[in-house]
Amino acid sequence: MSAHDPARPRLLRPTVLFPLLLALLGALFVTQSGSSADAATGTLLRDGTGLYPRAVRLAHSGDANGRILASVVTFSGNDGLGAIHESTDGGASFREVGTVRDPDAAGGQGLCCSTLYELPQRIGDMPAGTLLWAASVGQDEPNRRMALRVFKSTDVGRSWSHLSTIATASNDKGLWEPEFSVDASGQLVAHYSDETDAAHSQKLVAARTADGVTWTGHHDTVASTLASDRPGMAVVRKMGDGTYFMSFEICAAAGQFQCVVHYRTSSDGWNWGVTTSLGIRPETADGKYFKHAPNLAWAPEAGNPKGRLFLVGQVLYNRDGSKAAGSGRTVWVNSAGGAGSWREIPAPVAVESTTVDYCPNYSSSLLPSADGNRLLEIATDWSGSVCKPYFATGSVPAA
């Protein structure tokens, strides 16, 4: 399952989500027998719905540096909310400290796929350490015109106010999965998935802002020559040598490599080369690959200017297309800027579910320690009919 299948149910309010899910399972998802109740290891981040987890370790927030903030999408009645959790003990425990309440996600209008970001430097009037939260809203409106809306917090996630809108759809198609980075020019960049172009089922787009308010330069970063291809779910990290690394999935016609994970690199975080280039498929030495909902992290590594990349995908496959034994229990590491083979390490949170949909191990959040030797993961899994987030931290084994 992909975040980019045109007919898939997005992260809707619970009153409509589960009936839709049940109706579409046969056509959209690959499901095998097996219990999914409380399948994930780790500790519950919250005892209730918590979708699309994201986590940041504060590094530009003065006395709050070292705290970990985590966000998930949740619901109260028909209102979509961003729940903000905080850890002051290195990820050993979390408590809820704030809520993002977007009126455009209230009353059943729809909320999906949020992100959380700490500004590493001043952007306009916003000092370094300002927190940003962004999400897709409006997918359930009768006259759908989705938007990517940004909120900010200047009090370590306790309160939030609307800042700007990255993009608003020109038609009833989708805008999904915003993620942030700061490019080499010092501007804030938003990366997102765009379904509004009639020439592409979906493509990846970037826009940027010098002040956090006015977004300009909207342009394609990955757009296949095949109209049916659906590149999406981009996440960008800047490596230690200044190179920018983008992970994403490409969903297309059914087959062994449907929704397989790819990557591209950029020298400045804004220009990504020929837009029709679909990038490189990362693999392990024995040919394993990830499919669906990738997520990415970077950390320094002693003696290595590039640092260390961490990559996770929803499902892990063997070279021959069979599901790998370590699927749902594996994270990858690479110390060569993505080049060459990737090394497998145990995932801190093990998700044993055999269901492939928008919950189990879907876009799991990875957060390395400051020295890169430990890794916090927040992953979701079904607990009965509720998609819940679980967290745990593990050591990163030496190569």
Locations of the language-model features?
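Blade-level signature of beta-propeller repeat domains, shared across WD40, Kelch, NHL, RCC1
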Residues: 364-399
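Hydrophobic core segments of beta-strands in well-ordered, beta-rich domains
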Residues: 55-76, 115-118, 125-144, 149, ...
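Asp-box/BNR beta-propeller loop motif
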Residues: 40-41, 85-98, 151-163, 208-217, ...
